[in-house]
Amino acid sequence: MIGAGPAGVYSSDIFLRQLKKLGEELGLGTKARIDLFEKLPVPFGLVRYGVAPDHPSIKFIASALEKTLDNPDIHLYCDVEFGKDVTLDDLLARYDAVLFATGAVKDKPLNLPGADLDGVYGAAKFVEWYDGYPTGAREWPLSAENVAVIGGGNVAMDVARELMRNADDLKAKTDIPDNVYEGIQGNKAKVLHLFIRRGVAQAKFSVQELREMEKLPGVQLIINEDDFELDDDTIEEAGKDKLTRQMVEELFTIREMAEDMEDDGDVDYEGNPADRKYYVHFNSAPTEILGKDGKVAGIRVEKTETGADGKMRRTGEFEDYPVEAVYHAIGYKPAEAPGITYDEKGAHLANANGDGRITTEAAGGDVRERLYATGWAKRGPVGLIGSTKSDALMIVTNMLEDLAKAVEGGRVAVDRDPESIDRLLAERGVKPIDFAGWKKVDAFERSEGAKEGREHKKVVEPDQMRELAHA
């Protein structure tokens, strides 16, 4: 497995379970060894480094992933980078199958005039900063008093919320490191505009994200009443999908809250004075980042109309907003893997009709035996963490089917000495961090957090992680 995030860990667990259940029938036996390679010094990928720190459900997911890794048939190799420390040829010589679960770590480019101005930031880089990504920035410019966030999904909501958060409140409830706490303490943002191209019924927010937006201390929510004038067809269409219906209902609840905040004299959700304003603009498509002296000075937005079918129509009506920083959360681009064809159009590793079998070309091409992809590496950056489970089951089913055929035709000759990979890494001077090493890092984070009355306090420097893990 390449990648120890949710996709890689879920796939490992499901593979072992399905093998135990079906292995004898398929002629494969019921036992396997899974080696899980991760380029970072610690596991969990998106769960640790891609989700806002104030999501309480995330620690439960991390706990479940950790239980899976605490399995004698799964061997964790953190701090080992595919393409640098080990190659595809190295792995194919030692394993019956290789599964890529490499996720997505880069921002999709913002293709707007002015996107290269100083003060335009991709959400992925900002998330890296506040989540303490090992190779991410340690400081972040937060001097802008007026800020714009572009995007209609959960990542945009995360970014906007963190920009409006109170530093002390965030520290008390999360594992943020000192540098992030100090950065947010100095945050000058007073006004934030969230721009969503389509309408209320087409947004992609989870209900949980919306409820977290509602309860920001010291923040007044401001919403345009006109955005909530939905026609009968749109209401009917939204009602067909349970999650969409729940989201729209929650947005109407937020609209009522915003009205109350305004009527009560610019207060937050608890009726306390609000010193920050959070504007939510639906049917608003940014068309240009405005600049002055090479820096962001504003953003131009075109009003749109969205039909019941979700199609957006531009109106030709524009409005400029004065802002000094723009964050774009318009999607991620999954990581490329050396030696594997990348599908630029689909933004994922090339695989056969989405079944996870790696192919030689993005469109069609031949299936490359023993190579697979799962999660965002397979389908592109869509779906929540839970979506990777259904992905994993499909990929594992295909893997077992292919392995069974390989047994019938004479199994591929590979080096199955379990210590072979250890010797190779040692020869190259690579010192992997195993599960026991991760537990040492985790224990230190818990002890440091306890000193401040917190459950965890995240270690951010990779050298410190290595020192702790190898002690």
Ranges and model annotations:
Residues 3-5, 152-153:
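Glycine-rich Rossmann-fold phosphate-binding loop(s) that bind the pyrophosphate
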Residues 14, 62-120, 279, 287-300:
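Feature captures the FAD/FMN-dependent oxidoreductase FAD-binding
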Residues 19-36, 47, 157, 161-313, ...:
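Dinucleotide-binding/catalytic capping subdomain of oxidoreductase cores
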Residues 26, 31-33, 40-97, 254-272:
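N-terminal Rossmann-like dinucleotide/flavin-binding domain of flavoprotein oxidoreductases
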Residues 94-103, 148-150, 321-331:
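Short hydrophobic core segments
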Residues 107-186, 349-362:
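Glycine-rich dinucleotide-binding loop and its adjacent helix/turn
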Residues 119-137, 289, 295, 307-379:
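FAD-site-proximal beta/loop scaffold in flavoenzymes
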Residues 359-362, 366-471:
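C-terminal, flexible cofactor-proximal segment of oxidoreductases
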